[in-house]
């Protein structure tokens, strides 16, 4: 998948086009230490946003930017992740619900987006500052963010990193990630008929 967002589309009026910026970021390998891995490497849109790559761990876990290291888990699909509520304790059922991943590693999409770039066994960048430096060196990101927030924002690593997290999260709310195209979904729209066994 190639980004359809031109540089001119990044800023609309006085608000940053977070979803457009997020699409560019999602496919950007420069956010990894060796510049070999993007979000889409492990969440491939061509394979339902999962990691289909063969590796020495027989795909039990995903391979990171460093080919000699593996992540702590196999990358979950990013499909329908937008529908998971923020991680919280539900008083009614007396249990924890929501978040991204079964273990609640990230409370929401934005927090999840910020994890892999600085994870040493995933995208492998040493810290947020090094990522912000790469973002600033890219004219697409620099011009789009500066046009809305001004040059001074680049001095605030946490604010720039939060913009990156929010942008990727907004892209993951695009309809591409929630197509509702299964046979069951089509049956609900009277476009397909379930067998008796499927309907049980």
Where are these regions (language model features)?
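Periplasmic c-type cytochrome electron-transfer domains
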Residues: 1-200
């Amino acid at each position: 998948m190639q980004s359809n967002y031109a540089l001119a589309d990044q800023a609309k009026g006085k608000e940053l086009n977070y979803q457009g910026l997020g699409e560019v970021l999602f496919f950007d390998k420069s956010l990894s230490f060796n510049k070999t891995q993007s979000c889409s490497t492990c969440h491939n849109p061509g394979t339902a946003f999962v990691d289909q790559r063969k590796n020495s761990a027989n795909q039990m876990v995903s391979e990171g930017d460093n080919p000699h290291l593996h992540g702590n888990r196999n990358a979950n699909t990013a499909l329908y992740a937008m529908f998971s509520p923020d991680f919280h304790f539900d008083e009614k059922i007396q249990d924890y619900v929501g978040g991204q991943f079964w273990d609640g590693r990230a409370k929401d999409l934005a927090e999840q987006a910020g994890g892999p770039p600085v994870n040493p066994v995933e995208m492998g960048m040493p810290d947020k500052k090094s990522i912000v430096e790469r973002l600033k060196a890219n004219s697409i990101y620099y011009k789009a963010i500066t046009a809305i927030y001004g040059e001074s924002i680049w001095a605030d690593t946490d604010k720039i990193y939060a913009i990156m997290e929010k942008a990727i999260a907004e892209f993951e709310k695009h309809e591409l990630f929630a197509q509702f195209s299964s046979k069951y979904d089509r049956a609900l729209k009277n476009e397909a008929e379930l067998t008796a066994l499927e309907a049980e």
